[in-house]
Regions:
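Sec-dependent N-terminal signal peptides of Gram-positive bacterial secreted proteins and lipoproteins
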Residues: 11-34
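Short, intrinsically disordered/low-complexity patches at protein termini
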Residues: 27, 84-87, 141, 146, ...
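Domain-terminus/edge residues, biased toward the C-terminal soluble/receptor-binding domains
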Residues: 179-411
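N-terminal secretory signal peptides that target proteins for export/translocation
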Residues: 1-11
């Protein structure tokens, strides 16, 4: 009995040891997978708030407190620029008011009632970040600075930037009864996406922000001015193609910029990225985030041929068999390209959800929508396609009954 008991104990110990080995191996696999996913994520960013966005889809790939509301300094001017491009007339001019003249540095140094072409002032705005140029532009397009700020806030809401509030066209620290001049890194990236990807004036915006230097004069030609682009990131990384710097005492150093390489386009937005004497922090953070995007994300075609079900058409006419009581109609997914390329990490998986009517009432038109196919990533919708009918189905109405009976019994 003792020998039998001892043998059972040995077997039991072997089982426990084997079970423990399996559990340890499984845990190590989970740890390794997690480590592989996180080892390349940007760490120790200087910015208090940061976002890396896929500019094509608008999906945020990485963020550090990206939804925190903070002042954004002269990165404000990307909104000022794009609104002006979309609203100004060819050859339109603006006159410097006393308020414009009073703007603090950095400024162009305009004189009261001096007149400029708005196109020239946009280069002053974006290359040198001149605060007085921003006010001339705002008062010309919006009637007043307050009127222009209202346009800025309206556009922000259109773009889904619900945590953004504009008071000034130049980004100087400001506060009123509704709050402070502020945004989030996520909203700032959304505004930049609009400027470089979606606006009808995106080409002009890029032309201005990519210009190295620019010369112009006032309308009368009495004074000449020269502007130099201070966006050092343009020469810092291959593929960098647009951006805007900013600084105020409250906002600290801020930056929003874009890069395109290997068919991938990224936007980085940084808020509160150091204070003097740490002017270069924003470039270090921008490079780190851009390299993270380039090294970890690739386009993948996630399109799948979804087998949409045939749908019962109640009271429908079957051409092949008019007396058939059950008529089914073929369906398809309305995507002629048969392709859906999404910027993804290796481990990211897209889920597909099909929603389709089980039955519909006749008459049914060709290409009539009867459902959707939706692609999700981490619970968020990436893309949605309609499920439509392949052909039309007529209704068994009174006229159809009369015609059918006539053909059957009278002809």
């Amino acid at each position: 009995m003792r020998e039998m008991y001892g043998e059972k104990m040995k077997i039991w110990k072997r089982f426990i040891n084997m079970f423990m080995c399996i559990m340890i191996c499984a845990q190590m696999c989970v740890v390794n997978i997690y480590a592989e996913e996180t080892q390349n994520e940007p760490e120790e960013l200087y910015a208090r708030s940061a976002v890396l966005m896929d500019a094509d889809s608008g999906r945020i790939l990485f963020q550090k407190d990206g939804e925190n509301v903070m002042p954004m300094a002269s990165t404000t001017k990307i909104m000022t620029c794009i609104l002006t491009l979309e609203n100004m007339e060819d050859g339109q001019t603006g006159m410097a008011s006393d308020y414009a003249v009073s703007q603090p540095k950095v400024h162009l140094g305009v004189r009261s009632k001096e007149e400029f072409y708005l196109e020239d002032l946009l280069y002053s705005l974006m290359l040198e970040s001149h605060n007085d140029s921003a006010v001339i532009i705002a008062e010309t397009i919006g009637g007043t600075v307050e009127g222009f700020a209202a346009l800025m806030n309206e556009k922000a809401k259109e773009l889904g930037c619900n945590d953004t509030y504009f008071i000034t066209p130049n980004g100087l620290d400001a506060e009123d009864e509704n709050g402070i001049h502020s945004t989030t890194a996520a909203d700032l990236a959304r505004i930049m996406k609009y400027c470089i990807m979606d606006s009808p004036e995106k080409d002009e915006f890029l032309k201005i922000t990519q210009t190295k230097s620019y010369q112009f004069s006032d309308v009368k030609g009495e004074r000449s001015f020269s502007c130099t682009n201070h966006n050092a990131f343009l020469d810092m990384m291959e593929g960098a193609f647009s951006g805007k710097t900013g600084f105020t005492a409250n906002a600290g150093y801020c930056y929003v910029g874009a890069l395109e390489r290997d068919g991938k386009t990224f936007i980085v937005a940084l808020l509160a990225c150091g204070w003097p004497n740490n002017k270069t922090y924003k470039w270090k953070d921008t490079r780190k985030l851009m390299e993270y995007g380039l090294n970890n994300y690739e386009y993948r075609n996630v399109w799948e041929e979804v087998k949409s079900k045939n749908v019962l058409v109640e009271n429908g006419v079957d051409k092949a068999n008019p007396y058939n009581s059950e008529v089914y109609i073929h369906t398809k997914v309305a995507n002629e390209d048969k392709e859906l390329s999404i910027l993804l990490k290796k481990s990211e998986k897209v889920e597909i959800q099909v929603e389709q009517d089980e039955k519909i009432e006749a008459p049914v038109a060709k290409n009539e929508k009867i459902g959707t196919v939706t692609y999700f990533l981490d619970g968020k919708m990436l893309k949605q396609y309609d499920v439509v009918t392949v052909n039309a189905v007529k209704e068994k109405d009174l006229l159809w009954c009369i015609n059918t009976l006539s053909r059957e019994y009278l002809l």
